[in-house]
């Protein structure tokens, strides 16, 4: 196999997005568009990858890190000019170079591999990825000769009436003999309506020099969608969502209503897990097997163990063990670690807490900045009072502790193993192991008080 290189064009400003966010960084199913492209081209066995950046260069570099080298297009003068900015990295290399736009998040490695194979088998100097569509308005047209060979690519704005009738379009993805590409770029003119240096002109230059120019027509037109505005962004989101949902269902995940279920591109879900309508799974979430998620549940950047149930709840940046029950209407906030066989019930909020195996907070509780042992029962209305208006403090609850209903644990405080806290207590000091702590006013019953009060009011 000859050397393979790729150039990703990601320098466009994206004016039509009408956004402060750089265009190729807009997410599709939770991942920036350009990251989708990089993830796919990285499967092609590349020797070098160069991303051409312009507006928002630093943000793109931060997103992609050391996966790619970068070239700066300080002034946007067209796609040929953009590719030429990679000359310092690639111009002297022998091999095949793939050129693709950073705003095509739906492209797959399989389609690009097919393009590269067509290029190799045809012995071509250039091969363009094309598609056939009924309404090609706005796309460059593929002009072929009487033998069906590619002659040139004409941009929509420069096409004549005959060329506008062509329905085979340029998708903006190409592969070239690397040295032929960079030798041809200097020959590209900007004598066109836009006054730009078009990369498709390289096709005509190579053809006129007698080189073989090939085309690979994909049947997956959706993959070639370029995102230039919010409408196209929403279209890409829907297509990617359906693709992700289908992949999960094929792999053994039950999705009750795929049209109302959203799974990020990087999420991993085990077999025989059921997702109910309104479920949103974001970021790098990993969900085990035999789980039941939803309805109306959001999980972000979290790890969920096998056989866990989460109903109408939110889990962020946390880890849950196996056979955990969460919800309905619970909120597990970042940096929480929930053990196995735990119950987090309705209207319970847990934040930055380690919650031990088989422990439970069944309803109406707030547990923050705490370490909760195993086999602990937190009664209804249990509160860790962790904030004094300036600093956060830790509550430690040992194994086998029983906290009665409507109790406040004022941190920093420790309740040792096996201790009991009576209902209605406000605990401000440590509770020894196996002690009963009662911290509430003693009940006083005043006999016949009501009759005396009512008689007094009558008089």
Swiss-Prot record:
Its cofactor is Mg(2+). Pathway: Nucleotide-sugar biosynthesis; UDP-N-acetyl-alpha-D-glucosamine biosynthesis; N-acetyl-alpha-D-glucosamine 1-phosphate from alpha-D-glucosamine 6-phosphate (route II): step 2/2; Nucleotide-sugar biosynthesis; UDP-N-acetyl-alpha-D-glucosamine biosynthesis; UDP-N-acetyl-alpha-D-glucosamine from N-acetyl-alpha-D-glucosamine 1-phosphate: step 1/1; Bacterial outer membrane biogenesis; LPS lipid A biosynthesis. In the N-terminal section; belongs to the N-acetylglucosamine-1-phosphate uridyltransferase family. In the C-terminal section; belongs to the transferase hexapeptide repeat family. The active site is at residue 363. Pfam families: Hexapep (PF00132), NTP_transferase (PF00483). Residues 1-230 are annotated as: Pyrophosphorylase. Its main location: cytoplasm. One of its GO terms (biological process) is regulation of cell shape. Keywords: Acyltransferase, Cell shape, Cell wall biogenesis/degradation, Cytoplasm, Magnesium, Metal-binding, Multifunctional enzyme, Nucleotidyltransferase, Peptidoglycan synthesis, Repeat, Transferase. It comes from Bacillus cereus (strain G9842). This is Bifunctional protein GlmU. Transmembrane segments: none annotated. The keyword Phosphoprotein does not apply. One of its GO terms (molecular function) is glucosamine-1-phosphate N-acetyltransferase activity. It comes from the Bacteria. It catalyses: alpha-D-glucosamine 1-phosphate + acetyl-CoA = N-acetyl-alpha-D-glucosamine 1-phosphate + CoA + H(+); N-acetyl-alpha-D-glucosamine 1-phosphate + UTP + H(+) = UDP-N-acetyl-alpha-D-glucosamine + diphosphate. Its EC number is 2.7.7.23, 2.3.1.157. It is found in: Cytoplasm. Homotrimer. UDP-N-acetyl-alpha-D-glucosamine binds at residues 9-12, 23, 73, 78-79, 140, 155, 170, 228, 333, 351, 366, 377. Acetyl-CoA binds at residues 386-387, 423, 440.
């Amino acid at each position: 196999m000859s050397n393979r290189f790729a150039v990703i064009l990601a320098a466009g400003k994206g004016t039509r997005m009408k956004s402060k966010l750089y265009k190729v960084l807009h997410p599709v199913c939770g991942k920036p568009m350009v990251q989708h492209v990089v993830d796919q081209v990285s499967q092609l066995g590349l020797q070098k990858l160069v991303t051409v950046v312009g507006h928002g260069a630093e943000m793109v570099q931060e997103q992609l890190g050391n996966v790619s080298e970068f070239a700066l297009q300080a002034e946007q003068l067209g796609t040929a000019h953009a590719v030429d900015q990679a000359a310092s990295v690639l111009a002297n290399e022998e091999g095949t170079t793939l050129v693709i736009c950073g705003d095509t998040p739906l492209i797959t490695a399989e389609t690009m591999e097919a393009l590269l194979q067509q290029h190799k088998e045809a012995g071509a100097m250039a091969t363009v990825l094309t598609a056939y569509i009924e309404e090609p308005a706005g796309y460059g047209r593929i002009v072929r000769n009487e033998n069906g060979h590619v002659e040139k690519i004409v941009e929509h704005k420069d096409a004549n009436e005959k060329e506008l009738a062509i329905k085979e379009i340029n998708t903006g993805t190409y592969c070239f003999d690397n040295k032929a590409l960079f030798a041809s770029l200097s020959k590209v003119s900007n004598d066109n309506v836009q006054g730009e240096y078009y990369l498709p002109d390289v096709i005509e230059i190579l053809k006129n020099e007698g080189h073989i120019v090939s085309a690979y027509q994909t049947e997956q037109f959706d993959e070639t969608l370029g995102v230039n505005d919010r409408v196209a962004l929403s279209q890409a989101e829907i297509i990617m969502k359906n693709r992700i949902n289908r992949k999960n269902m094929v792999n053994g995940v039950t999705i009750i209503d795929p049209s109302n279920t959203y799974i990020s591109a990087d999420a991993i879900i085990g077999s025989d897990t059921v997702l109910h309508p309104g479920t949103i799974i974001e970021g790098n979430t990993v969900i085990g097997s035999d789980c039941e998620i939803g309805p109306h549940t959001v999980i972000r950047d979290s790890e969920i163990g096998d056989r866990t149930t989460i109903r109408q709840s939110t889990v962020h940046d946390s880890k849950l063990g196996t056979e955990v029950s969460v919800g309905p209407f619970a909120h597990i906030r970042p940096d929480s670690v929930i053990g196995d066989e735990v119950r987090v019930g309705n209207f319970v909020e847990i934040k930055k807490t380690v919650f031990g195996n088989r422990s439970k907070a069944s309803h109406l509780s707030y547990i923050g900045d705490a370490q909760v042992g195993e086999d602990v029962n937190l009664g209804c209305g249990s509160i860790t009072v962790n904030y004094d208006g300036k600093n956060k403090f830790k509550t430690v609850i040992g194994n086998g502790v029983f906290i009665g209903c409507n109790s406040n644990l004022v941190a920093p405080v420790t309740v040792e193993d096996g201790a009991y806290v009576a209902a209605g207590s406000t605990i401000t000091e440590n509770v020894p192991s196996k002690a009963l702590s009662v911290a509430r006013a003693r009940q006083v019953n005043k006999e016949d008080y009501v009759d005396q009060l009512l008689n007094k009011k009558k008089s």
